[in-house]
Amino acid sequence: MESILIVSGTRPEIIKLAPLYHELKRQPWARVVWLHTGQHAQMAEQIMGSFDIRPDLTLVRQGDSLLDFSLGCRAQLEAVLTGERWSTVVVQGDTESAFQGALAAFYNGVPVAHVEAGLRTYNLRRPFPEEGLRQMIGRITRFHFAPTARSRDALLSEGVSKQRIWVTGNTVVDAQQWACEHRGIHRRASGRGHMLVTMHRRENWGQDVEQVCRAIAQIARQHPELDVLFPVHLNPVVRGPVHELLADLPNVRLTAPFDYLEMQQALADAWIVLTDSGGLQEEAPTFGVPLLVLREETERPEALEAGCAGIVGTSTDAIVAHVNRLWNDPAEFRRMQRAGNPFGDGTASRQIVRHLAAELGVGHSSAVREQADVVA
């Protein structure tokens, strides 16, 4: 029996690790332990409940600052990892929880499995601190599960052996398929649908948020028949200017942040998405919804190459121009709508489990390794 520790801390990690957790739980050779670090304590219980997950271990968050959290998390993870023999530690993405989980595993000689490996902008300030964290995780990872060929190529360029990289697709698509099947997510809106807007990234705080809000206000006034749905981040740095500039517009609805299932339903009913979220760049194409990225660069260029997304930055004029182009050009809108999802087909979790089984010496390892070499 192989003991596998899954480390999660934030909403996106839970979403993307949930389908892998359920797939691992079905394996007779795996003992799976879900550990939650408490990084996003308020959101965790609800989102885990949405995926029928009850954590086996929950760390006690110490202090409010990132430094306090990191120190407390590291010490508690050390106790967990030294308490028994682990076959591998699974982390996802580029959060502080993922980094601390990977670092604790590395120090204790436990192989790290990194889900969503190889995303890069090579700009340590954008996104901050995620770009630095994922690069550091990449240096100490044994099993790199890259969502796309581009992510694999980034790892190869950094000197990672191709024998340690598997292109699996992104588990976020698996999670969406699970939600559609088990929670009844489907398009319910009639007509065009709404414009869905989200913003939360640290690099967009301040003037960038204000510019985006001015663009939304201009679009809402130009198109009074278009409903704008904006679940607003709780951080006052974001919440303040959003409410100041948009609260009085009759066709703009400002809400509290959505839970996962609410966001999936909002995506299914959307005409277009404006966001700085990485996760939504991966999710919107599943529902055939064009997306405009409110950033200057993205670590998910596959969406741009496929044609289902475009980068507009945070310039008021650029945002308004891009939205109006899609409003006035049905052919361009349909092209983006029909581009498909370049991030996977919903089988990523099954592929990851097969490859882990091969590397850990259980299951049909030779067949899996042969298939992995073909993919790589």
Describe the function of each predicted region:
Residues 1-230, 236-376:
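Nucleotide-activated sugar donor-binding and catalytic core shared by glycosyltransferases
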